[in-house]
Every structure is written in structure tokens, then in C-alpha cells.
Amino acid sequence: MHAPQSVAVTLSVALALVPALAGGCASTPVRPAAHGAEAPVDPAIAPLSFMAGNWILSQPNGATIEEHWQAPRGKALLGSFRRVLGNGITPFYEFTQIVAEKDRVVLRQIHVHGNFDTDPRRAEPMVLVMEKCTASMATFVPAKDGANAGALARVTYSAPDRNTLLLVVEPRPEAGKPAEKPLEFRMKRAG
């Protein structure tokens, strides 16, 4: 058993070493940006503000789809998606960024399994470019430069009303086969 005094000395030494072990991080205070000092929203992505929010869809099979979009800020907005099955298992997640670049708006998305392992078929991000956009709708199509989009033709987000976000995923038609029906996810604002 250690004497109370030696425990106090050991604790004091350990606490004194924390800033050094943390690479000096603890000695540099973090100051929040001054109010009003935020980067202005790039005009190319400003119309996408209709996507911001928490969105949810309860499916008849007991699964729940959730999508969360941060508001556009600077040149980007970020989104996350998960599908939770009725038994509580999340088979996959998707993380998406939409970024205003020099001459286009790009949507990049990564897909990971529920255990956060990368899907080998989707090791590289899917890359789409904005085809058209209004104040309540945005359509993205595969980029020509390595889109990694598989059989995807287009993705459209729209807001039929303030509390609904509609995601439509359209497959690319295959030659000689009947066109597949688009997938539609009509999500409601959560909270």
C-alpha cells in the first residue's frame, strides 16, 4: 500500500506530464471563432440548404432509415446515412460530402459495413456531379472521371414540403432489359 503522500506526489507528476505527452495540445487553449466570423456559404451549394436536418423513414419490415445533413457552410455540407433493421443490427453506413469546386459541385460518398469494414466493391468513394439544382431539388449523376457508381444513373434529393426529404435513386438501364423502377425514400423531419 502506498502512503497517501507518495500517491499525491505521483498524481501531481502525472498531471504535470499530461501537456508534454499530448504534444503541447493542453497548453494551447482552443478559442471558438468570433461570432459572425463564419465562412460565407458558397453560392453553388447555398440552394442545398433544403437538405439540412435529421430525416427518418420507418419501413414496413421494421427497418428504420435515418439520414442527417448538416447545413451548407463554406464550400461543403456533410451527410450520414444508416439503415437499422428491426432486430437492431445496422448492416451499413454511408458518409457523404457535397463540395463546391472550381467549376462544379461534387458529391462523394463512402460506404462501410456495420462493423465499419470497407466494402471491397466500394473501396473508393463514389463520385457524382450536380446536374441540376433549384431551391428544393438537386440531381447528381456519375462523374466521368472514375465515378465508382456501378449501375447508378442519378440520385435526386427534393423537398416536396418543409418536413419531407425525398431521395430517388435511379438505376442505369441495361441494354435489352426492362427499365428497373427507381428506389424512393420519403423521409420525414425528425425532432
Give the residues covered by each predicted segment.
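Short, structured patches in soluble enzyme cores that scaffold and shape functional sites
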Residues: P142-K144, A159, V169-P171
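N-terminal secretory signal peptides that target proteins for export/translocation
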Residues: M1-V7
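N-terminal helix-cap/turn-to-beta initiation motif at the start of protein domains
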Residues: A39-N54
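Extended Gly/Ser/Thr-rich low-complexity repeat segments
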Residues: A153-N163
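Edge beta-strand at a domain terminus
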Residues: A37, P120-A135, R162-G191
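Bacterial signal peptide processing site
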Residues: A26-T28
